[in-house]
Amino acid sequence: MPKPKVRIIGGGLAGPEAALQAASLGCEVTLYEMRPHRSTEAHLTPDFAELVCSNSLKSESENSAPWLLKQEMRRADSFLLAAAHASQVPAGHALAVDRQKFSAWVTTLIDSNPDITVVREEVTRLDPGSDEITILATGPLTSPALTAELQRLTGSRHLAFYDSISPIVDAGSIDMDKVYLAARWDKGTADYINCPFTKEEYDRFIDALSAAETVPAKEWEHLPTAGQLLEDRLQRSGEEAHHSGSGAENPSLTATRPGAPGLASETWVSQNAQDVQNAPKTTPPPAPKYFEGCLPIEEIARRGHDTLRFGPMKPAGLTNPRTGRWPYAAVQLRQENLRADSWNIVGFQNHMKYSEQARVLRLIPGLENAKFLRYGQIHRNTYLNSPAVLTPTLQLKDHPRILIAGQLSGVEGYTESIAGGLLAGRFAAALAHGRIPEPPPRESAHGSLIHYITHSEAKNFQPANVTFDLLLPLEEELRKKIRDKKERHRIQCERALEAWDQWLSRSTE
């Protein structure tokens, strides 16, 4: 009997995990990836699971929310999490990987699997009437053509925020006489290079950062949204009608998004690009919308002179062995690969011009002669308004044979994306075998993420990392009885893992 087929589009993190899960559950998988024939503004290689931002899969501290999510993934035999452990580099209590080894490991897993066929071409059309189950896992850099196709199917405008990438420096260019190795609060091993600041050095750095020139916004970053264009067009049409004395409806205003009166589709925007040029020049473009968990340092600095000292440059817990005290501020560097010949500047994603980055970042103590292997940059992250279009099993409400996985679904972060792929692969396999998939329990970290992206208020939906705020809270009586936050988190994790194990046993029967 032939194996049921599953088609997966996207070779980032969610797609390969979904492919390996579905193949392990008896499906014949076709995995589509457009690279290298068409790349994105952030990718550098054609490999699967290329990490384009940091190299960290977050905390491994027991009973933390990121740890809980990874524990659930381990119990579900996540292939990419196993690859992360196989390519791990020292990073204190965090799980960080050698990017190239991690990507190579995943690529080998995919290429060597007899039940996975790789097709290197761009997919621009989706057939919701096909008998084949399809998982769309094209990530935050989904191509314009596929984004338009997805919009056509969902009748929903995609959303986006701007994400940034941290710089990487050559290890040999770091002045080790000015820095020191330590882990915050001495958790784990001393795997981070710490660059300590005095108050004077910090003030000078902030002044230079605040005055630095950023990369001019690309045209698409400042294009009015469909709603803004329509509102402007209505206003101009009203003015024309007022001057002409006509109250007749303007027929050109009827091209609105299906199912959403008053909002024009992005396709309509592209077909009426002339409106962009005709838009009022006095109206400033909207400020870029950033994900709060990954703000560019210049954006953080705009929020106050000392804001960075309470964020990426927080000195708390980083005792300088030369002084026996915490510095006024500190920048941390995390090892990029097993050779330890390159280090990334933790949390220092930015949108400055390259020449400005070199000038400003060389004000960091120990990096005065830094050689940059990669500068920071910014790119657009696209995601769906999932509460409006997705079911708790990641299926499109109107086209249930199409599933959405990874960052496109509204989760944020490497681990969360892999987790979404794990679920989508299992859901797709169940559907392909003629079964009804069961969503993960609300108590679990996976279930909490799914609940968030499918039950949030659609109007104000924003991507989310896994946190205890998303998890099912303890009963009020128990919360009052247990005051210690760590103990409450331990109980939440214990309940989550118990519910997850029960779900796993049911879903594999």
Question: How would you name each of these model-derived features?
Answer:
Residues 112-238, 280-339, 343-354, 358:
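Predominantly flavin-linked oxidoreductase catalytic cores and closely associated redox partners
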Residues 20-82, 443-449:
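N-terminal FAD cofactor-binding segment of flavoenzymes
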Residues 2-14:
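Beta1/beta-strand and adjacent pyrophosphate-binding region of the FAD-binding site
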Residues 99-118:
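Helical element adjacent to the flavin cofactor pocket in flavoenzyme catalytic cores
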Residues 464-509:
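C-terminal auxiliary extensions adjacent to catalytic cores
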